[in-house]
Amino acid sequence: MIEGFAPKVDGFDHFEYGNHTSLKKSITNRTAAIMVETIMGEGGIKVIPEWCLRGIRKICNQKKILLILDEVQCGIGRSGKFFAYEYSGVKPDIVPIAKGIGGGFPLGAVLMNKKTASKMTPGTHGSTFGGNPLAMSVGNAVM
């Protein structure tokens, strides 16, 4: 799926979707997080199996790696549940969301569990357009 999106961002490795062996081979002592789309929508719909998502969570726990579940396309009810990862019972550390939360208006957010959020101290993250009153009103109406 990376064809046409070169050059790759430095520091990211890719593993075969839904393949734990491929994932384990890509983990090094420098791996900070594993990021997975719960439902891939490029080139057809690909849903990561629940057993696979639970296995990735287990690997993250064992290696003390953050689990980022990308819900940009499938979040906010688009899968039938509020988040697609809810089908597996897995609890991610970070969840990027966007398209569904804005109802067609450009809006995104990043959700984190308490442990991860506690590392984000004031002044460590900012946004040029963060808190835009119109965008926040749209997001509030969608929610």
Task: Cite the ranges covered by each PLM segment.
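Conserved N-terminal phosphate-binding loop of PLP-dependent enzymes in the Aspartate aminotransferase
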Residues: 1-143
